[in-house]
């Protein structure tokens, strides 16, 4: 996520350091992943994290929401901080794509990894944003 700059990376680090992410699998916890960002407070990410690559991509996605809302609330008043539905997925998708491109570059000659990343780009990034939301 380095291309997004030091300020953005500080927000990501703050999320990890200050435990914004509830990743434990507990009884009664909702499945899937969700980021809640109340105005004037830190974001909260709810998800199950089993340390597989799918969960890493989901975490990158939810951190995109968290980073977006932290920056929006820092620079907008309470009435202007929430984006439209058409824009809300852009920062999280950007995070996903940056991680996917980073992994693809690191994969070298590992064709299996490159195929997996390409499938993620279609199955999760594209499908989630353009089929489930619109």
What are these regions (language model features)?
Residues 1-134:
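Cation-handling catalytic/transport regions enriched in His/Asp/Glu
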């Amino acid at each position: 996520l380095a291309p997004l700059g030091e300020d953005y990376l500080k927000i990501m680090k703050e999320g990890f350091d200050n435990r914004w992410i509830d990743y434990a699998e507990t009884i009664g916890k909702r499945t899937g992943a969700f980021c809640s960002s109340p105005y004037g407070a830190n974001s909260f990410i709810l998800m199950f994290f089993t340390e597989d690559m799918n969960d890493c991509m989901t975490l990158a996605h939810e951190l995109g929401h968290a980073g977006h809302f932290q920056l929006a609330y820092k620079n907008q008043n309470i009435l202007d901080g929430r984006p439209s539905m058409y824009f809300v997925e852009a920062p999280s998708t950007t995070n996903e794509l940056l991680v996917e491109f980073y992994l693809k570059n690191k994969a070298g000659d590992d064709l299996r990894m490159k195929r997996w990343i390409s499938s993620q780009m279609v199955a999760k990034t594209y499908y989630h944003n353009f089929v489930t939301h619109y």
